[in-house]
């Protein structure tokens, strides 16, 4: 079942490049002929407008966390990437059906048998592990509260095989073995809304777990649960989004955090020292990290409640450009994504707006290339993946009403 696709253009935007302001108006289509169009819209609509957990895309399927309001229609739904048709559904019990019923899912082969699993934290206070093709439950991993963030599958702890790492909403860290055994836990005693990450942050050839919390503190855990550092990232706002990458020439990675007060903060992965701090506006959000302009130095791409998207130098936090993609007053803005949307070997920036718009930008300049919209809010970032092996990434966006839209971008040669 498909809804009619709509392609729109942005009525007005402002680009600020190194202090220069450029205004432009767009009417009746993009002058470059590029188009962002919907190939399907899923039949997973709900009566509430509060869905805000992103989908996962892997192996020909989209896994959509669908929330509602205690009417029994909360679910994790598997659908085909080609047509959005439902393949299987896991229903959350009505008493657990809330706007946080199912958090962002993860797809991974946990046990190495060549068959993927889907993992999702739920309001049943567990991480549910499903056989990806069939939707059958393989195991349930108990949490102390519901999970808000995406489970991580990584070779992390000093144990055989890969581990499952989950941080529930009240800040308890769980590390499970691939057999479901709890290896260790730790309590942060604060809410965690930003996505945790496992990587070798300090450059010692061993992975660590980085977690940011409501208090504005970030904590780096070693694989045995030992705290390696604890840093105050913000005294004025909660950490709600984060990303990471190699921003400079030292071996350690940098953690990049965005806060409700509007700060974007770069933190050294070895020591936890704050390397830079930039203010972009309230409810800052960050996810994309990469060399979007091809100059050999990475950028981080940030949004804020005022509807603007910013490119920041990842090493210094200096703002390289700013573009307004949403003109109307909105509640928040999801963070933008990087991906090769047209298959030409270079990346584009995709910004989902809380007003229901999805905008493609040139990551080097901030120029708006194309846009799509539904008259429904968006509360989370898109998921970008080349799901049909055509060398071009597709974007999957979940709207607040629970419908998932697959978007494709075409740009003339």
Protein language model annotation of sequence segments:
Residues 1-413:
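Hydrophobic alpha-helical segments
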